[in-house]
């Protein structure tokens, strides 16, 4: 089945009020003609209000967020609930990013709880999975990805991946300038889809699987030419309007 591509920008810990306003103004101009690709941006949560205001009057670019908590309210200092994100019209919520897994010791099981919280709230989880360089060199890529996916399936069932997104981000390629070759990325994406298909072909067929890890305006077109790469989760290049727009346009063209 034809899957509509999704390109999402993860701003990480970058930006300011002025930066948010300026970048979104530039993106609105650059992406004004886009009709064949879904687009989302995830600024730091402090700038969601600024971003929501800046995005008013257009429907091409959707808001997302970089994190969510499993609790809905209460004594959880520094956390963000699904309801808070919904108030700013955030739709696509990143969970399981390797930086959260590494720096905040988030386990597969904890990430599964975040996934459940998002599904309950009607938000779209963008589940990041991927292996370290050591795991890659040891031939454990499929094993690691399967484990991270199975944490969701074992807790919520494979149907939880309906209207959800998986972002395959090999940790050795994030922010390093290294990127998996299109063939390498496609092989992992095909494995991910087949792993889901073993439980449900219908769920696998509709699942958006993004690639992340040093995606830029130079390598995007070749990555998107692969049949199981349905878009990208973009880091550094999402902070530059022209580069991010080129990635979106490459996805639209490749999947037309």
Swiss-Prot record:
One of its GO terms (cellular component) is cytosol. Its main location: cytoplasm. It holds the Pfam family TIM. One of its GO terms (molecular function) is triose-phosphate isomerase activity. Pathway: Carbohydrate biosynthesis; gluconeogenesis; Carbohydrate degradation; glycolysis; D-glyceraldehyde 3-phosphate from glycerone phosphate: step 1/1. PROSITE patterns: TIM_1, TIM_2. Its EC number is 5.3.1.1. Coiled coil: none annotated. One of its GO terms (biological process) is glycolytic process. Disulfide bonds: none annotated. Keywords: Cytoplasm, Gluconeogenesis, Glycolysis, Isomerase. Belongs to the triosephosphate isomerase family. This is Triosephosphate isomerase.
